[in-house]
């Protein structure tokens, strides 16, 4: 007979063997369900039918506006200690008004229509290469784009821009800027022939002709080159060169006035200032364009800067009202200002799709090179004099004292450097030493189908999530900050000793 419990109901007593067998069987069933294969179609259908959980943290829409430069932000991106609930403040764009630059110029209707065409955006890098006045020197890995995932622009090694002479050497075909001025009767055929070894499906001669006419009419660099080439046709004319100035005025996005970007120089060019670009009439030797030159970007990306708007220069300054003198505008501040949507402002740069990806990679290499140049020029500030150098030498096991002092010291502040990685490794071990081993190892993955990203991209035609990596990064950063707050302040997993 089954005994009765305290409530009077009969209860069954389980043996230890039965309890162990039951729990073991349930574990086996759970493991078998976890190991059950999931097909791609089944996973995709489950993702489409899935709706956000009631506890899903939605960052809202990007509707907040910076009071200084009209940049668009999410409310969660505000600077908390200087913001109010009804008046958020931001500084990722213009550093609270200290970075002041005019808005981009409105492009011609022809270019605006092309940037709304999905077919054009798919091949925008090819079209830009056709009209680029400098060559893009880098090892671009195109084999990773096999059609099974989003488009990725990946470069190995250094990036450099090269510019040649105004006229091509004898028995050679024109390339890059030479196509604007040499053999103009066959310009369209020359540009298409330049990409004869690539897949030309979708390259439209009509689009090439339209872009050529537009750039010749509005781009100041093209005007300088065309005026110089007219002197080439004069028999017995004096030798000359083209000088592209480095000392630009402190302004951006203004339409370059004639004569402000460069000039034709006759005879000696010894008075050229540092980093000026000197182009000779017929000289087959290509020269490397310095990243410090304001023409570095507009010469390479004429479709993003159709008027020839100049880029960053060391002569640019921030506007600090309470400072005795203006501080220099860093490369990082300049490009951070550029890649923000602004209320009521049309930006070709942000609608560039795959070309925008290439521009971001190019801009990041400029930022990293600027940091490396600063470190190289201030080695004495980063070394703890002789003691640090000796300690590093002993740590490496060097016995030859002649090698001490000949290496470049990369401090821990340089992102990705050996000391940077070692410092973070030591910080992680220090936390474990004080608080013990971690109880949770949590991974946090970004989903490009998050509602915030999808809603923002729906405002712009023909763009995919991979075309705006800046938006993906910003939304992911907000989610990470909110998740950490969810763990630490809400104590979801209990009291947090370290995180």
Model-derived features: where do they sit?
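Non-catalytic interaction regions
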Residues: 1-499
């Amino acid at each position: 007979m089954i005994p009765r419990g305290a409530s009077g109901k009969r209860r069954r007593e389980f043996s230890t063997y039965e309890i162990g067998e039951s729990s073991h069987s349930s574990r086996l069933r759970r493991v078998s369900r976890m190991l059950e294969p999931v097909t791609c179609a089944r996973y995709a259908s489950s993702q489409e039918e899935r709706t956000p959980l009631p506890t899903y943290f939605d960052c809202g829409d990007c509707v907040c506006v910076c009071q200084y430069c009209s940049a668009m932000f999410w409310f969660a991106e505000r600077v908390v200690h200087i913001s109010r609930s009804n008046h958020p403040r931001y500084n990722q764009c213009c550093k609270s008004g200290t970075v002041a630059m005019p808005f981009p110029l409105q492009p011609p209707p022809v270019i605006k229509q092309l940037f709304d065409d999905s077919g054009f955006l798919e091949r925008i890098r090819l079209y830009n290469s056709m009209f680029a006045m400098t060559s893009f020197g880098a090892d671009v890995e195109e084999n990773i784009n096999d059609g099974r995932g989003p488009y990725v622009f990946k470069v190995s090694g250094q990036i450099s821009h090269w510019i040649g002479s105004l006229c091509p050497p004898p028995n050679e075909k024109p390339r890059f800027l030479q196509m604007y001025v040499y053999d103009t009767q066959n310009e369209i055929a020359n540009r298409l022939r330049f990409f004869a070894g690539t897949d030309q499906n979708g390259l439209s001669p009509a689009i090439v002709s339209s872009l050529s006419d537009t750039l010749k009419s509005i781009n100041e660099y093209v005007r300088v080159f065309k005026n110089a080439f007219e002197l080439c046709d004069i028999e017995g004319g004096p030798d000359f060169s083209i000088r592209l100035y480095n000392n630009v005025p402190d302004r951006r996005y203004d339409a370059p006035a004639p004569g402000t970007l460069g000039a034709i120089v006759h005879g000696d060019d010894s008075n050229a200032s540092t980093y000026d670009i000197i182009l000779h009439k017929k000289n087959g030797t290509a020269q490397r364009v310095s990243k410090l030159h304001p023409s570095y970007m507009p010469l390479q990306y004429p479709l993003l800067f159709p008027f020839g708007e100049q880029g960053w220069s060391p002569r640019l300054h921030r506007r600090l009202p309470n400072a005795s003198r203006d501080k220099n505008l860093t490369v990082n501040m300049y490009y951070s200002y550029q890649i923000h949507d602004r209320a009521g402002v049309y930006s070709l740069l942000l609608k560039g799709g795959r070309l925008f990806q290439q521009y971001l990679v190019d801009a990041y290499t400029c930022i990293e090179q600027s940091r490396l140049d600063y470190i190289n020029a201030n080695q004495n500030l980063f070394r703890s004099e002789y003691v640090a150098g000796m300690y590093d030498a002993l740590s490496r096991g060097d016995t030859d004292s002649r090698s001490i002092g000949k290496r470049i010291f990369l401090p821990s502040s340089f992102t990705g450097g050996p000391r940077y990685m070692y410092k973070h490794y030591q910080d992680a071990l220090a936390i474990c030493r004080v608080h013990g081993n971690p109880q949770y190892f949590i991974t946090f993955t970004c989903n490009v189908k998050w509602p915030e990203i999808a809603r923002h991209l729906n405002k712009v035609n023909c763009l995919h999530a991979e075309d705006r990596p800046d938006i993906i990064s910003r939304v992911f950063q907000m989610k990470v900050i909110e998740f950490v707050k969810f763990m630490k302040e809400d104590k979801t997993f209990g009291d947090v000793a370290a995180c």
